[in-house]
């Protein structure tokens, strides 16, 4: 079984602007590989963070230096006209799988709702570029986008929640769940089950969150549910993030477990890594 983390951040300078992440000035590919090997993680998808302007270059270097271990979900500036021309060849870059954006704050949140980004959905669909997003307040709007662009693969981050931007725990962090589950009717929408321990006030194996994982599994199925960590804000080890799914969820087993732990993500984002 290949174990592929759907989201990590790597950086080489600056402190994370999101205080839930480790407040260190670097988390390098070398550090990540060491911890991945220790935790039994085969590969990970890098999401270059905005607080380090060199993070995308670091991600490309990681792809080169550790073949098959890393891929990238990158970004183009949404407010620059020249960005539109870059989408067509986006996946031609080594290791680049797609695009990822946060839509929790204005102006990006407003652009999501008022049609400003219609060009993005149309262009990405035509180019076969999947998009991941953090958009807790806009799940209904994402449904409308998914319906209008059925060939565009959309992925919702962090169980649809606010990830590290929120201090809410347990049920209080999951009040959006009905709106997230409603998106399951769109076959082009998937969910990252990333960062789950961060939402828990309990110790490992974070049992209060298991009910929400089961709800996402029942609604979206194992081909549209992706394990991952966002490791630099986890209250536990990488290995425990793995075993929470592989050992503590008795309803997740066999082929479905293999899908959730990596196979489904690679298929959804088109990562043809060699196992």
Tell what function each PLM region has.
Residues 1-4, 25-43, 214-215, 220-226, ...:
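Mid-to-C-terminal alpha-helical segments outside catalytic/metal-binding sites
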Residues 3-8, 44-47, 72-74, 97-101, ...:
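Hydrophobic faces of well-ordered beta-strands that scaffold small-molecule active sites
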Residues 7, 36, 59, 90, ...:
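Conserved, mostly hydrophobic/aromatic
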Residues 20-47, 55-65:
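Alpha-helical scaffold segments that flank or form the walls of functional sites
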Residues 25-35, 80-91, 175-176:
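Short, acidic/polar
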Residues 53-137, 144, 192-196:
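Active-site gating/metal-coordination segments in enzymes
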Residues 110-226:
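Catalytic pocket-lining loop regions of alpha/beta-barrel enzymes
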């Amino acid at each position: 079984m290949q174990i592929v983390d759907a989201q990590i951040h790597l950086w080489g300078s600056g402190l994370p602007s999101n205080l839930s992440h480790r407040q260190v000035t670097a988390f390098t590919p070398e550090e990540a590989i060491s911890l991945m090997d220790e935790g039994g993680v085969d590969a990970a998808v890098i999401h270059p963070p905005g607080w380090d302007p060199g993070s995308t270059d670091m991600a490309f270097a990681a792809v080169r230096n550790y073949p098959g271990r890393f891929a990238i979900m990158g970004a183009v500036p949404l407010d620059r006209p020249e960005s539109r021309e870059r989408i067509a060849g986006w996946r031609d870059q080594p290791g680049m799988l797609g695009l990822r954006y946060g839509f929790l704050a204005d102006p990006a949140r407003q652009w999501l709702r008022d049609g400003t980004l219609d060009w993005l959905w149309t262009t990405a669909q035509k180019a076969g570029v999947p998009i991941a997003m953090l958009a807790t307040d806009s799940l209904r709007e994402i449904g409308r986008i998914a319906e209008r662009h059925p060939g565009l693969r959309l992925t919702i981050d962090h169980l649809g929640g606010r990830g590290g931007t929120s201090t809410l725990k347990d049920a209080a962090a999951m009040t959006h769940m009905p709106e997230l589950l409603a998106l399951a009717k769109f076959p082009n929408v998937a969910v990252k089950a990333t960062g789950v321990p961060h939402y828990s006030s309990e110790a490992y194996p974070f049992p209060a969150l298991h009910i929400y994982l089961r709800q996402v599994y029942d609604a979206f199925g194992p081909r549209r549910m992706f394990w991952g960590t966002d490791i630099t804000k986890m209250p536990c080890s990488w290995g425990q993030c793995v075993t929470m799914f592989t050992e503590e969820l008795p309803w997740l087993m066999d082929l479905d477990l293999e899908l959730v732990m990596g196979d489904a993500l690679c298929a959804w984002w088109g990562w043809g890594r060699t196992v």
